Amino acid sequence: HWNEEEPPEIPVECAKCHSTPGYLDFLGTDGSAAGTVDQPAAIGSVITCVACHNEATLTMTSVVFPSGAEISGLGAEARCMQCHQGRASTVQVDEAIAKNVGEELDTVSPDLGFINIHYYAAAATLYGTQVQGGYHYSNKAYDAKFDHVAGFNTCVGCHNPHTLEVKVDSCKLCHTNVASKDDLKNIRMAGSLVDYDGDGDVSEGIYYELDGLRTLLYQAIQAYAAEIAGTPIVYDAATYPYFFIDTNANGSVDEGEAAFPNAYNAW
C-alpha cells in the first residue's frame, strides 16, 4: 500500500521486514550501524535470497524482541525470528496505560487505541512468557517455550524456510494420526489431561482447546465493552483495524460495521 504514499517508498519502520535493502540496513551489512534501519527502501525491493543469506546472518545467534528480551544460543532460525516476532508486547501496552490512563483503569481514554502485535508473530508465540508477545498480568503465571524433540525444536526444524509450509511428512513419523496439515490440529499429548476451555472434552486436539479459550476471551471482551466501557465491540480478523463498534449490539459483525470510520474508540 506504500505505492499510494508520498513519496512512494517503504518507510523506515517497515523496511526491515518488507525489503532486502531494509533488512541489510538492519544487519549493518551496508556499512551502517547494526540494529536499526536508517533509510526507507524503494517500492518493489522485496525480500530476496541475499536478505537471509549473507555474512551477518551466518553468524547471527541472538534476537532481541519488542519487549527487550533477548533470546540467545540460536542457529539458522535467528534470521526468521528477526521479523516473525511482532512489533509490540506487554511492555508497549503497559507504557500506553501508564501514559494515557489515570488511577481509574476502567475509565475510557480518548488517547488509547488497539495495539496490534503485527502479523505472523510466530517467534513471540513460540517463546511465550520469555518474550511476552501477548499481554502478561504481573500476578499471573504463563508458559515458556515448549521444548520439542531434537531436530524439531526450531522454526526451520518444522517449517520449510522458503515456503513456510510445515514438514508434515516429518511430523507423522511420530504423530501417526497425521496425514495432512489439517490433522495437526488434532495432536494432543497423552499427558495433557486439563480441560483448558472448560467444554468437557479432554481428548480434542490442543488447537481446539486454544480455539475454545479464544472464544471465551472474545466473549469476555464483548461483555466488558458493553457493560463497563459502554460501547459494544465486534472483531473482524480480515479488516483493519479489526475492532469495530457493534452499532446494533447484536454481537456479530454486520454489513457496514467493519469499516475504518467505525473503528472502536472506547478503549
What kind of region is each of these model predictions?
Residues 9-12, 75-78, 150-153, 166-169, ...:
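Generic recognition of stable, solvent-exposed alpha-helical segments in well-folded globular domains
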Residues 150-189:
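Structured mid-domain segments that build the active-site/substrate or prosthetic-cofactor binding neighborhood
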Residues 182-262:
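Acidic, glycine-anchored loop motifs typical of Ca2+
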Residues 23, 89, 164, 223-230:
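Intrinsically disordered or highly flexible coil/loop and linker segments, enriched in small
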Residues 1-78, 82-160:
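Sequence context of c-type cytochrome heme-c attachment sites
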